[in-house]
């Protein structure tokens, strides 16, 4: 996932379009006023094709059509909308989304065919959910962290299923998580099964809009169920008995309210973070502990691998940077190059 980067001129045009839409929605509606009520503020709970569920300030959810002039609308967008009035035969008319407020953040995912697609808007933090089963993968955690740093959205690492650890296993996992604690990331250890550790997580979620990211099988949906107080069948990623991997059931991004305060957007679009569209320099910047050593290498075009005089490699050798993180950095770069090669090969076949 990535955050669209606009030039100053493009940003000015986007802002002007937002203001024009907001002004038009209040002064010159394009639709018959007899069909719709007064403009109101709301937030998009979910998007379905050319329709969206919008929650009003009083907490009611309204199914709305979307104006054709609105090019992009995703869960989490703050909008101006108008409720539909009851028709003559007593059937309620759908409301209409008139305009979209400027976003504070937008999460997108790269797509081979359609470029970059928005997934959700106005996210405050990304909760990276991992687990000791099926496998604790620091490489996957590092990929998520690079995406968060690129998006400039705060991450929280949550390790689930700690109830399955014995004392020795807990000591090992804590040692692994210290790698992230030591470079400033917040790490929480929880169990959605026993609900151990949920209180600190609830506090971290209160008053913020979060999105949970995690591979299949880590118990992300079970954790959301425990936090939301929902029944198992409402949000679930059941684990296959044969593979140990979760079976996805969520089909559209949707915003939920936590009972303790705060919101979460549950989206199938953040199961994996595609990084292949990023430049190598962006990946390097995504490793926060590298920052103090950038620009100190002997050669300006240093690849931070076997290059002589590489300040980052020297920091690894001196124990200032975790070797595991350094290895994952190169794994990410290698996987990016492979994906780009496949994409370029596919493009030449068309």
Curated annotation (Swiss-Prot):
UniProt entry keywords in alphabetical sequence: Cytoplasm, GTP-binding, Hydrolase, Metal-binding, Nucleotide-binding, Ribosome biogenesis, RNA-binding, rRNA-binding, Zinc
Family label: Belongs to the TRAFAC class YlqF/YawG GTPase family. RsgA subfamily.
Coiled-coil ranges per UniProt: none
Cross-referenced PROSITE patterns: ENGC_GTPASE, G_CP
Task of the protein: One of several proteins that assist in the late maturation steps of the functional core of the 30S ribosomal subunit. Helps release RbfA from mature subunits. May play a role in the assembly of ribosomal proteins into the subunit. Circularly permuted GTPase that catalyzes slow GTP hydrolysis, GTPase activity is stimulated by the 30S ribosomal subunit.
E.C. no: 3.6.1.-
Lineage top rank: taxon: Bacteria
Organism: Escherichia coli O139:H28 (strain E24377A / ETEC)
Keyword Protein biosynthesis in annotation: no
Protein name per the record: Small ribosomal subunit biogenesis GTPase RsgA
